[in-house]
Amino acid sequence: MGEASRDEYKIQSFDAETQQLLKTALKDPGAVDLERVANVIVDHSLQDCVFSKEAGRMCYAIIQAESKQAGQSVFRRGLLNRLQKEYDAREQLRACSLQGWVCYVTFICNIFDYLRVNNMPMMALVNPVYDCLFQLAQPESLSREEEVDCLVLQLHRVGEQLEKMNGQRMDELFILIRDGFLLPIDLSSLARLLLLEIIEFRAAGWKTTPAAHKYYYSEVSD
């Protein structure tokens, strides 16, 4: 789908003033407080998982616009500082809001997917993203379908990139996932199916084989 047809960036859920702020940041970043923009985007991402899936694309566009206009990175710095702050408080976030936690993981993985330095993923985000995924692979998280679903979706999205950046941690993560699949913890049938699917997805080189696609998607639809 072309960029022009997607320029709304799913910001309809913001109030009119904030929508205008974001639109200005995309077109004329020097005219707005970019640290405020970063905080607005993170705040909304923690509350709205639909937006958190889109936010990386918007952040990338603002970073590109600011770099082109002024050769600066005020927005990126503000965004990364706020991500670090939320990362440091992730255990409290998970304890008080499961939805906020899932939205945060979705958001940081989305940012990792979109932000590039010299056409490479940002090294500064590799370990924080891994740490979040490791938490999702703990037994108490695997007993919650929302966390299993988040884990599998994010590995589909950024697993291959993460493995290229640090293969040892990916091996360790999948040991946890396999243990969760095999050990007698309280896994729902859907969670067990999702874990098996991601194990086979990685084993096939981060690709879904036609047979696997047919099997898993028929199972989920049933």
Curated annotation (Swiss-Prot):
GO cellular component, one term: Golgi apparatus
Subunit field text: Interacts with EIF4G1, EIF4G2 and SLBP; probably tethered by SLBP to the 3'-end of mRNAs ending with the histone stem-loop, it also interacts with EIF4G1 which is bound to their 5'-end.
Family stated for the protein in its record: Belongs to the MIF4GD family.
Keywords: Cytoplasm, Nucleus, Translation regulation
Biological role stated in the UniProt entry: Functions in replication-dependent translation of histone mRNAs which differ from other eukaryotic mRNAs in that they do not end with a poly-A tail but a stem-loop. May participate in circularizing those mRNAs specifically enhancing their translation.
Molecular functions (GO terms): identical protein binding; RNA binding; translation activator activity
Protein name: MIF4G domain-containing protein
Compartments, as annotated in UniProt: Cytoplasm; Nucleus
Matching InterPro entries: ARM-type_fold, MIF4G-like_typ-3, mRNA_TranslReg/HistoneTransl
Coiled-coil residue windows: none
Gene3D superfamilies membership: 1.25.40.180
Residue span, MIF4G domain: 3-205
Stored Pfam families: MIF4G (PF02854)
Gene that specifies this protein: Mif4gd
Superkingdom of this protein's organism: Eukaryota
Major localization listed first in the record, in broad terms: cytoplasm
Any one Gene Ontology BP term: regulation of translational initiation
Keyword flag Nucleus: yes
Signal peptide: none
Source species: Rattus norvegicus (Rat)
